[in-house]
Design a protein with these regions (language model features):
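Conserved PLP-binding catalytic core of the aspartate aminotransferase-like
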Residues: 283-314
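Active-site phosphate-binding strand-loop segment of PLP-dependent enzymes
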Residues: 9, 108, 120-175
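PLP-dependent aminotransferase-like
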Residues: 76-141
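Conserved active-site segment immediately N-terminal to the catalytic lysine
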Residues: 168, 182-193, 202
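PLP-dependent enzyme catalytic core of the Aspartate aminotransferase-like
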Residues: 3, 316, 329-359
């Protein structure tokens, strides 16, 4: 029996995608082999990666002057690649809204003068700071955000005013969850293991003028975006199978009605859970309502023993991976695109029952 998987990542994938992949596991489209066994230089695989790029461009309405790169090393590797490729003036502005933004900021400080221009650390990252009038150094090469904070459950509803500077966004946990205007960003990147596919792949969407040979001295060949762009993400062997699964997820999103439909689907799920948390006598959310994520919903009972009891009983009932991040405790329900509305409805039913028995 399949469970309702609320993991923050790797996370739930559309069941029909998994079934399709299972059907093609031993023989992909008459090739007599699995995609896992296929040469990345073969015509069959070339068609897979090209179609994946075509579909994500269509879904996100990506302009022609942006490159789509399928990279390895996860989002964490881009914490270094971003300053290596963009720090011409050795300066950058970071908005610290959680652990992943903080880690990216700390990495950037290795390569240049990274400054924190806003932070929500004062209230345990439970809100998004006002970013309408930031004190950004004039010669900053870029402004960096983590758009959705997986651990703390916050989301930028309005992008920061970068005052003409390039915006770089880690969108790992909100990737393809709603429509996005790509032209507002210089760089968008995300690990796919939360909302798009299996672990081990990051998709980067980068404006072409930012892809140059003018990188920091000592930048490894593999971390130069130009290396990857010039070779259509095939400089070395890519994560072939993850790209194949992502391609299937892109088709699923198109079939579901695209990103507008995804947003409606995700808003419905989030509303069911937040509405319950707002009226519950036992459970409570931990985020400022105006900054709540549609993807990651942290909540607590206020009692660590009760939290642990809830997680244990929920797991036994088929609601798995609800334990909060190890650094913050409590609970967290990650309700990505592939989580059905029924999964959230049944979780809330279980929470009501638990509250009646333990409140």
């Amino acid at each position: 029996m399949r469970v309702y998987n609320f993991s923050a990542g790797p996370a739930v994938l559309p069941e029909e995608v998994l079934r399709e992949a299972a059907d093609e596991m031993l023989d992909y489209k008459g090739t007599g082999m699995s995609v896992m066994e296929m040469s990345h230089r073969s015509k069959a695989y070339d068609a897979i990666i090209k179609e994946a790029e075509k579909d994500i461009r269509e879904i996100m309405n990506i302009p022609d002057n942006y490159k789509v790169l399928f990279l390895q090393g996860g989002a964490s590797q881009q914490f270094a690649a971003v300053p290596m490729n963009l720090m011409k003036n050795k300066k950058a502005a970071y908005i610290i809204t959680g652990q992943w933004a903080k880690k990216a900021y700390q990495e950037a400080k290795i390569y240049g003068d990274a400054v924190a221009v806003a932070s929500s650390a004062d209230k345990t990252f439970s809100y998004i700071p006002d970013c309408s009038d930031l004190d950004i150094p004039e010669d900053a090469d870029y402004v960096y955000i983590c758009e959705n904070n997986t651990i703390y459950g916050t989301k930028f509803k309005t992008l920061p005013n970068t005052k003409g500077h390039t915006l770089v966004a880690d969108v790992s946990s909100c990737f393809l969850s709603e429509p996005v205007d790509v032209t507002k960003y210089g760089v968008i990147y995300g690990g796919v293991q939360k909302n798009v596919g299996p672990a081990g792949l990051v998709i980067a969407i980068i404006r072409e003028d930012l892809i140059t040979d003018d990188v920091l001295p000592g930048t490894p060949t593999m971390l130069k975006w130009k290396t990857q762009a010039d070779n259509d993400s095939l400089y070395n062997t890519p994560n072939c199978y993850a790209i194949y699964i992502c391609g299937k997820v892109f088709k699923w999103i198109k079939k579901m009605g695209g990103l507008e439909a995804m947003k409606v689907h995700n808003e419905k799920k989030a509303k069911i859970l937040y509405d319950f948390l707002d009226q519950s006598k036992l459970f409570k959310g931990t985020v400022e309502p105006k900054d709540r994520s549609l993807m990651n919903v942290p909540f607590v009972t206020g009692n660590e023993e009760l939290d642990a009891k809830f997680v244990k009983e929920a797991t036994a009932a088929g609601f798995v991976n609800l334990k909060g991040h190890r650094t913050v405790g409590g609970m967290r329900a990650s309700i990505y695109n592939a989580m059905p509305i029924e999964g959230v409805e049944k979780l809330v039913e279980f929470m009501k029952k638990f509250e009646a028995e333990n409140g």
